[in-house]
Amino acid sequence: MIEFDNLTYLHGKPQGTGLLKANPEDFVVVEDLGFEPDGEGEHILVRILKNGCNTRFVADALAKFLKIHAREVSFAGQKDKHAVTEQWLCARVPGKEMPDLSAFQLEGCQVLEYARHKRKLRLGALKGNAFTLVLREVSNRDDVEQRLIDICVKGVPNYFGAQRFGIGGSNLQGALRWAQTNTPVRDRNKRSFWLSAARSALFNQIVAERLKKADVNQVVDGDALQLAGRGSWFVATTEELAELQRRVNDKELMITAALPGSGEWGTQREALAFEQAAVAEETELQTLLVREKVEAARRAMLLYPQQLSWNWWDDVTVEIRFWLPAGSFATSVVRELINTTGDYAHIAE
C-alpha cells in the first residue's frame, strides 16, 4: 500500500515548504448546506461559530443546554477542532415554544442564528464548504504562484486526506488487523472508521497509479464517467471516446475511480483491468470490504476547487480562498502547493 505522503502528485512534488495552520485563524471553514431552514417543524437548526472546539463536544454541550439526549443533536459533517469554523447543528425539540439559544454559552463558541426546520440534519447532508487558508513561511513564492495558476486549470487529485486513516494510520492498521481475522468488531464507530479507511486507501492507490500516466485525463475504453456535480455515472465505449474526451476537457464530465467493495466496480474492459491491477496486491482489504458487504461505488478522480482566489500579504504569506463539494479535502489542495510543516489534519465532509 502506498503511504499517503508518497501518493503521486498531479503537478509534481512542490519545490517549497510552508506552514499550515500556524494558528486556528489561519484555517477558516464555512459550511454550506445548500438550503435554508424551513422556519417551522420539530427540529431547530443552529448555526454556530466555533474556535478550538470539536463538533461532537459542541453537540453534546448543546444537548445538555436543551435538556435533551445527545442523540437528538445531529450535524452534517465533522469540523476540525484546530480551526475557525461555521457549521450547523440540528436539535430535535418538539413543541411551539422556541428556546432562547442566544443564552447558550460555551468557551470558543457563538450562536450566530437559529430557526425551526422540518427534517433532521443527517451526516453528509451538505453541499460543501468554503475555505479561507493562510500559508505562512512560504519558501518559494514563484513555485506556489504557478501551482495556483495550474490548479485553476487542471485541478488536484481527489485523494482522501491523511486524517481519514487516523493518527499514524491507526484506522488503516485496524482495518488490516481485522481483515486478517474473522473476529467480529462490535464497536460501530471502529467498524465505520476501519471500513472507510480501507476503501479510501484503495481509491487513493488507484488514483495514484492513474496519475502516473502521461495524460491522466485521457478517457479509455470502459472508463466510468460522471456528470460534474452528480453521483450517477456511465461507461465509456470505444465509439464515443472522441466526444467523451471533449466533454471531459470541458469539465462537463469527470473520470471516476473505484471505491472498491462488493458488487461490480463500474468500469469495464481496459479501465477495469487497470483498476484491478492497481490494487491487485491489496487482497486482504478487498476481501474485508466484500465480507462486510460494503458496496462498491465511484468517486471523481480529480477535484476542481471552485471560486479559487489568492492574495499575497507579503513574499512569504499567502491567503487562499476556495469552495469544495462535500466529501472533499482541503489538504488535497494544499498538498499540491507546498510541503507543509505543522498540523496537516482537516476534513471537509
Curated annotation (Swiss-Prot):
It holds the Pfam family TruD. GO terms for biological process: tRNA pseudouridine synthesis. The active site is at D80 (nucleophile). Residues 155-303 form the TRUD domain. Its EC number is 5.4.99.27. Substrate binds at F27, N129, F329. GO terms for molecular function: RNA binding; tRNA pseudouridine(13) synthase activity. It comes from the Bacteria. Responsible for synthesis of pseudouridine from uracil-13 in transfer RNAs. Belongs to the pseudouridine synthase TruD family. This is tRNA pseudouridine synthase D. The gene is truD.
